[in-house]
């Protein structure tokens, strides 16, 4: 038995890890087009004489994970099986990083409430002032008669009005997807469950309460996966220990998780990793029960790469999934008191005026992981603005750093000269699920079933969720499905 996995990011690595454990007699070849594994999980340590540790740890992509939900359980299951619990950095639910979050609109910081008292105070802020009336009116708004997909922006405006959508939801979409909420698919976004609640109950405010009481938030597949994960003693134990944890990071950076998976895979005799070796051919084998990848026959192929790459290999229906690019600028100050406020960071909605450098958000990294005992932030710029007008992309890292420092001055009044900076353009890093994404995905899967005998399985951020947790969860589910298929055919 043999399986090929195309793509060495977190989704491909997770799939390989679970497959190798579930089917130890199966040969697994993992193909990665680049020189390293891990995809967008990129932690770098840069030498710095002014840091007590001699280096500064920067994250060039995502940096934290959450323990909550089914995806959170999948994160914890992988961590427990890798045995890297001691490398975690837990962030308490009571910490400033968990409680204090901000939206910058129109020219000031608006604190997002984390308590009832905070909610009372927050309604006087310009970004959140429309919320109370919108929440009161929401149950009385007409629901959508059909179940067709629509944009996140369209859905939210129907249910909560223009101001809440433009000032609050736009900020969230910028932070999660670096995208335009007017283009993003409601059904395929992380808010898709709200559309299901509207369809069943007619509104969100009361419907959400009823759905929570009836435990209807999770799909049957999610409930089954949750039960399977909690049946693992170490996973359940780790989950219980995370009750007061809002999120967690890794002491040596988020790349700890992908490096740990790679180390485990290298120890497994049934796994071979092929770096700098992309899938150049993907065709049905002459026996029609196998698939050829680069001339090698496999019983199944897990495609954990972009739909664009898949479309270049086989004559399948096109997903037409665009992407967002983000300039990530890391900034370190040896002074630990540079930040004027404490918290996780701030997000900027697209309707905020005077945002010429298209800043999406600023993360206060030193609140979460600060071995350097200084002040550390990450400024993220671009997203849909870069997609719509590529001339807005800074032509070099120096320009990006200058833009980021201007944004820090404008939003947080930070004028201090940084000790160390690092700028990285992450091109095409976040897939943008357009309206109709799920229908397109179903069409692609049907084509694979008909023309490739169902021998190709899709996983990763291009198909079923862009977060690390989504990728790990879907990698786990893909491995379980493959194990079931191969066991039933043997």
Swiss-Prot record:
Binds 1 FAD per subunit. GO terms for biological process: protoporphyrinogen IX biosynthetic process. It is found in: Mitochondrion. The keyword Flavoprotein applies. Keywords: FAD, Flavoprotein, Heme biosynthesis, Mitochondrion, Oxidoreductase, Porphyrin biosynthesis. GO terms for molecular function: oxygen-dependent protoporphyrinogen oxidase activity. Coiled coil: none annotated. It comes from the Eukaryota. InterPro entries: Amino_oxidase (IPR002937), FAD/NAD-bd_sf (IPR036188), Protoporphyrinogen_oxidase (IPR004572), Zeta_carotene_desat/Oxidored (IPR050464). FAD binds at residues 7-12, 32-33, 40, 61-64, 466-468. PANTHER family: PROTOPORPHYRINOGEN OXIDASE. Belongs to the protoporphyrinogen/coproporphyrinogen oxidase family. Protoporphyrinogen oxidase subfamily. This is Protoporphyrinogen oxidase. It comes from Schizosaccharomyces pombe (strain 972 / ATCC 24843) (Fission yeast).
């Amino acid at each position: 038995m043999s399986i090929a996995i195309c793509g060495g990011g977190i989704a491909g690595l997770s799939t390989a890890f679970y497959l190798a454990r579930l089917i130890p007699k199966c040969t697994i070849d993992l193909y990665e087009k680049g020189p390293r594994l891990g995809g967008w999980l990129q932690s770098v340590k840069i030498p710095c004489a002014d840091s007590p540790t001699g280096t500064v740890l920067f994250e060039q992509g995502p940096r934290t994970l959450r323990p909550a939900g089914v995806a959170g359980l999948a994160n914890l299951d992988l961590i427990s099986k890798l045995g890297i619990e001691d490398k975690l950095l837990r962030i308490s639910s009571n910490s400033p990083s968990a409680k204090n979050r901000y939206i910058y609109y129109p020219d000031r910081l608006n604190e997002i409430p984390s308590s009832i008292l905070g909610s009372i105070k927050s309604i006087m802020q310009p970004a959140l002032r429309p919320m109370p009336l919108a929440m009161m009116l929401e149950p009385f708004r007409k629901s959508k008669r059909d179940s067709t997909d629509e944009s996140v922006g369209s859905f939210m405006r129907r249910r909560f009005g223009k101001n809440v959508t433009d000032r609050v939801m736009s900020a969230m979409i910028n932070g999660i997807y670096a995208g335009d909420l007017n283009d993003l698919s409601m059904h395929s976004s992380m808010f898709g469950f709200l559309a299901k609640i509207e369809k069943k109950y007619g509104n969100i405010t009361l419907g959400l309460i009823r759905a929570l009481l009836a435990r209807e938030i999770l799909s049957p597949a999610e409930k089954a996966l949750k039960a399977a994960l909690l049946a693992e003693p170490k996973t359940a134990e780790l989950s219980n220990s995370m009750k007061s944890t809002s999120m967690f990071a890794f002491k040596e950076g988020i790349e700890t998780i992908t490096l740990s998976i790679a180390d485990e895979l290298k120890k497994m005799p049934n796994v071979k990793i092929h770096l700098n070796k992309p899938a150049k051919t993907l065709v049905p084998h002459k026996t029609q029960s196998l698939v050829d990848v680069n001339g090698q026959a496999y019983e199944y192929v897990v495609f954990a790469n972009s739909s664009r790459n898949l479309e270049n290999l086989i004559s399948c229906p096109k997903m037409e999934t665009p992407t967002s690019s983000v300039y990530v600028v890391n900034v370190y100050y040896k002074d630990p008191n540079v930040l004027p406020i404490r918290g996780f960071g701030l997000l900027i909605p697209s309707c905020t005026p005077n945002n010429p450098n298209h800043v999406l958000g600023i993360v206060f990294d030193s609140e979460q992981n600060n071995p350097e005992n200084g002040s550390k932030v990450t400024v993220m710029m671009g997203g849909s603005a870069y997609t719509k007008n590529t001339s807005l992309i800074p032509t070099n890292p120096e320009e990006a750093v200058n833009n980021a420092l201007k944004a820090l001055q404008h939003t947080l009044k930070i004028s201090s000269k940084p000790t160390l900076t690092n700028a990285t353009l992450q091109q095409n890093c976040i897939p943008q699920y357009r309206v109709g994404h799920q229908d397109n995905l179903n069409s692609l899967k049907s084509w694979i079933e008909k023309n490739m005998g169902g021998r190709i399985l899709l996983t990763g951020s291009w198909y079923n969720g862009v977060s690390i947790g989504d990728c790990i969860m879907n990698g786990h589910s893909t491995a379980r499905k493959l194990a079931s298929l191969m066991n039933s055919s043997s």
